[in-house]
Amino acid sequence: MQSYDVIIVGGGHAGCEAASASARTGARTALVTYRLSDMGTMSCNPAIGGLGKGHLVREIDALDGLMGRAADFAGIQFRLLNRRKGPAVRGPRTQADRQLYKKAIQKLLREQDNLFIIEDEVVDIIVKNNRVSGVFLKNQGNIFSGAVVLTTGTFLNGLIHIGDKTWPAGRMGEQASVQLAERLKNYGISFGRLKTGTPARLSKKTIRWDVLPKQQADEDPVPFSFLTEKIKQPQIECAITRTNAQTHHIISENIHRSALYSGAIEGVGPRYCPSIEDKIIKFGERDGHQIFLEPEGLEDDVIYPNGISTSLPEDVQISLLKTIEGLENVNVLQPGYAIEYDFINPQYLSKTLELRSLPGLFLAGQINGTTGYEEAAAQGLLAGLNAARQVGGLDEIILSRSTAYIGVMIDDLISRGVCEPYRMFTSRAEFRLSLRADNADARLTPLAQEWGIVSHKRWTCYQNKQQRLDHARSICQKLFLTPNEASAHGLQINNDGVRRSAYSLLSYPNMNVARLTDFWPQLHSIDAKTVESLEIEAQYAVYLERQKQDIAALQRDESLEIPSSLNIQAIYGLSNELKTKIQKISPRSIADAQKIDGMTPAALSLIITYIQRQRREKGKLA
């Protein structure tokens, strides 16, 4: 009889991170996947990171996960998005060579102690005494465990649509998980349907690259992993093209043949990654939509046309593509398609990602209503970690909204649910000044060390980095200038007689360590990476102190009761939409009000201030 502590179902991004995290705790872990060769496959776009998503990858890496290291190994076009904006909203991103990425993930999994990889299909879960105790495999029968993590992606009752053609599949060329979906319903688990889509794949050789503008990689690529010292793969360029009036005419004339508009698809698609049909219908006034032509690998003939996903019939896809500049003679290697799949309302989960109605069953990834590799991987890590800790009799791990973007995402999912695929953005985090991509290790690696999931190499690397930063900070805090001394060097500060440290001067606009070396040459000894960390820390110091107070105040206010007599209509500045929702839901506390869909920190502040003012006025009357 095969027995493990934790079984992971699925070898996608969520499953790989779940398996690694579980095994790193010391738990005997099994990862069950259809095909060993498909572990870590990038099913859709050949890219990792982006706005909000890049923060998740950095956090996964800070917790010693896999995605950041694999992306650095496979990255072929690194770009730091929002580079000109503040550090809090900068988003690391890279295009990745599909084959190299998969190779990196599989290597990391093969090298992981306590991890056993099984090639088979899970067709049922085993439940004893209302608790999951294993899975049933199609070929090998029962295997048992203390907990199971389901990471089925788009495979659970997956259905591909191309025009009027529909067939069961998890992704193109792979079977759907139909039997498992039916068996799960027998345990009282109810499902919804979501949809996502992918564009056609094009032959690189048949594109007129010479007529198209290019997008270059950054000259100084910023890696994802705190362990990566240098990006080693050659950096490539992409090309940019656009749809046009002729493209739009073809789509409009054939919109009835799109699976999305014919009524064949019932699932809701991702708002922030619409199909080209949606773009034409919803933004008909635009004369064109941008398309990025992204190579899928260094030695690959396949091009991913980012921005033109579709479920139109194949003949229509070919026609519309040939109207686009540079693609007049393009050869389509694989048509675009939409895929529908089952998901579970994440409000049925606890914050450990365990299904409340079926103890021992944890869920991660698209089965929870999210979209994207990064969102899936982050959930997988937390689900695998909590599954292993539960089996080991250890306390559960819950990341708060003020600690990590992972905490923001999980709290959003559990408290608000989803009506469309959930995507991470920096705007979702109310404490984003402290949840930066650059300080993910400072926030999370010490926690991961406490949980026992960090390698000796990473912990040593982290300690060395912090020691360098502490030393540099100490130097800067001991160096002082008077306003007169600053003025003599061309630096204008308030002439108030107050001596200022080099550290405090770094918070001034357009100030940096390089400029301060004119006053203090000893600052030349600080290495470039430490300088960057020091400058960001100093720039945000005042704001972060204020944010700490806001976090502490919010934590105090969460327990504040909302009186049933509260006249919500009297709160000035609150939107009518929120007033209606509050009246309907009648939250009993600020913590309950936080969970209302659309609730913002600003709105909560208005409610808290109003309640506190009402209490003070009542106190005066008494």
Swiss-Prot record:
Subcellular location: Cytoplasm
Annotated S-S bridges: none
Residues that coordinate or bind FAD: 10-15, 122, 177, 366
Listed GO biological process terms: tRNA methylation; tRNA wobble uridine modification
Binding sites annotated in the UniProt record for NAD(+): 269-283
Major location (coarse): cytoplasm
GO molecular function, one term: flavin adenine dinucleotide binding
Pfam families: GIDA (PF01134), GIDA_C_1st (PF21680), SAM_GIDA_C (PF13932)
Record keywords: Cytoplasm, FAD, Flavoprotein, NAD, tRNA processing
The family this protein is said to belong to: Belongs to the MnmG family.
Role summary: NAD-binding protein involved in the addition of a carboxymethylaminomethyl (cmnm) group at the wobble position (U34) of certain tRNAs, forming tRNA-cmnm(5)s(2)U34.
Assembly information from the UniProt record: Homodimer. Heterotetramer of two MnmE and two MnmG subunits.
Record's protein name: tRNA uridine 5-carboxymethylaminomethyl modification enzyme MnmG
UniProt source species: Bartonella bacilliformis (strain ATCC 35685 / KC583 / Herrer 020/F12,63)
